[in-house]
């Protein structure tokens, strides 16, 4: 797939380590791309689960994917403030079908008051054993949790105060 440009719509697919499709987001609008990252927005986006259940995202969310970091970041924009959901996941790849990554179960939730919570540790451990995650991936993921927490604590990148405002405003300009 050629690198999508600003205003294009793409599909996002998350997989599990065993290669099974986990979840699909249809029609994510691309806000910015470069050789290493993609910033997009989901706003009332159709999501299809692996068991074919479907739902639509409730609020706008700015999404951030990187080719070098083992996480992606979703900034959920709500009336009461911005909260974040961060997936520990492989760096993304693009092909003719979609932006794709492997979801490794561990998640970090950042509440609007700044509180952080590591989620799904038991699910990660269960899948690590069941799907035989290599020790190298286990190590990489744990190191990337540290990098992610550092970004959160230092308001780096998607966690900066200006980031969500800048990209949400850009979304409104593009959708006109």
Swiss-Prot record:
Gene3D superfamilies: FomD-like. Its cofactor is Mg(2+). Mg(2+) 2 binds at residues 105, 107, 120, 123. GO terms for molecular function: magnesium ion binding; nucleoside diphosphate phosphatase activity; ribonucleoside triphosphate phosphatase activity. InterPro entries: DUF402 (IPR007295), FomD-like_sf (IPR035930), Ntdp-like (IPR050212), SA1684 (IPR016882). It catalyses: a ribonucleoside 5'-triphosphate + H2O = a ribonucleoside 5'-diphosphate + phosphate + H(+); a ribonucleoside 5'-diphosphate + H2O = a ribonucleoside 5'-phosphate + phosphate + H(+). Signal peptide: none annotated. Keywords: Hydrolase, Magnesium, Metal-binding. Its EC number is 3.6.1.15, 3.6.1.6. Mg(2+) 1 binds at residues 87, 103, 107. The active site is at 23 (proton donor). Coiled coil: none annotated. Belongs to the Ntdp family. Has nucleoside phosphatase activity towards nucleoside triphosphates and nucleoside diphosphates. This is Nucleoside triphosphate/diphosphate phosphatase. It comes from Lactococcus lactis subsp. lactis (strain IL1403) (Streptococcus lactis).
């Amino acid at each position: 797939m050629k690198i999508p440009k600003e205003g294009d719509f793409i599909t996002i697919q998350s997989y599990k380590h065993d290669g099974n499709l986990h979840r699909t987001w249809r029609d994510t609008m691309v806000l910015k791309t470069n050789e290493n990252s993609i910033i997009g927005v989901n706003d009332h986006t159709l999501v299809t689960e692996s068991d074919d259940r479907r739902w639509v995202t409730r609020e706008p969310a700015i999404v951030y994917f990187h080719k070098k970091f083992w996480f992606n970041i979703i900034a959920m924009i709500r009336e009461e403030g911005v909260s974040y959901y961060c997936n520990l996941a492989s760096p993304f790849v693009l092909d003719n079908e979609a932006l794709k990554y492997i979801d490794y179960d561990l998640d970090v939730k950042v509440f609007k008051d700044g509180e952080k919570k590591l989620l799904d540790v038991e699910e990660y451990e269960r899948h690590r054993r069941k799907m035989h995650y290599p020790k190298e991936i286990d190590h990489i993921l744990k190191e990337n949790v540290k990098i992610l927490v550092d970004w959160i604590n230092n308001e780096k990148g998607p966690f900066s105060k200006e980031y969500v405002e800048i990209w949400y405003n850009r979304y409104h300009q593009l959708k006109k």
